[in-house]
Regions:
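Conserved catalytic cores of very large enzyme subunits
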Residues: 1-231
């Protein structure tokens, strides 16, 4: 390896990786795992095809990881945050801001276990029971927190922003509609998620407003990636 070149020059393989000590450590570690993958995981024929450029094997530097993760907020809502190797555990959140903090920390932890993106299902629907009764201004402020907390977390692999996306359905999906809604403190609210459709739409509208406005420099947000579900 050209260790000096890796340390002094920015990573050209992934535009999301900054040029920092953490990033160069990632690049060096990936190089070792790429060699391992070519020698021990793939056949000689496949390895040679990759080296010649006939094919491209993506993310070989993460050969010991699954690619992507997609999960619901419901587990965090019900059980709180208790990460392996963490010196502390948190009970279920009683406030939306605390649930968001759990979500971001969990996403950061998951990013260390997967090679690709960390996705979240029906985010506006899951948060809706926590936002019921809030005014538009409060919901807009929470939407700003949601997007900025993810976009400014340069703590993932190599000091990247967390590669995450948010599923944002226009209406409560069928798989959640008749499910008992979990609210503050991990408790059953006595309602179904379909009863919170108005709250979920208000949050969705607020999130889209924040994306349209951009960050403090009027630049677009690259993360978290919004995925609008229309059906």
């Amino acid at each position: 390896y050209d260790v000096e070149g890796i340390i002094l020059m920015p990573n050209r393989e992934n535009a999301n990786i900054p040029h920092s000590p953490e990033a160069t450590s990632l690049t060096l570690a990936e190089g070792i795992k790429k060699n391992y993958a070519l020698e021990k995981v793939f056949s000689e024929k496949v390895g040679n095809a990759h080296l010649k450029g006939d094919i491209h094997i993506h993310n070989m530097g993460f050969i010991d990881r699954a690619y992507s993760s997609y999960q619901s907020l419901e587990y965090l809502k019900k059980f709180g945050l208790n990460l392996p190797n963490s010196p502390s555990a948190a009970k279920p959140a009683k406030h939306p801001e605390v649930l968001l903090a759990h979500m971001v920390r969990y996403a950061a932890a998951l990013q260390t276990q997967f090679a690709g993106s960390i996705g979240w299902d029906a985010v506006n629907v899951s948060f809706a029971p926590y936002l019921s009764g809030m005014g538009d201004r409060e919901i807009k402020q929470f939407a700003q927190m949601l997007i900025f907390e993810f976009s400014q977390q340069a703590v993932a692999r190599g000091g990247q922003a967390i590669f995450t996306y948010l599923s944002l359905p226009l209406k409560v999906p069928a798989h959640l509609a008749d499910i008992p809604a979990i609210g503050p403190g991990g408790s059953d609210t006595g309602k179904r998620y379909k009863d919170y459709e108005d709250d979920s739409k208000r949050l969705l509208n607020a999130i889209l407003e924040v994306y349209m406005e951009g960050d403090g420099s009027k630049k677009p947000f690259f993360f978290p990636i919004p995925v609008i579900q229309v059906t």
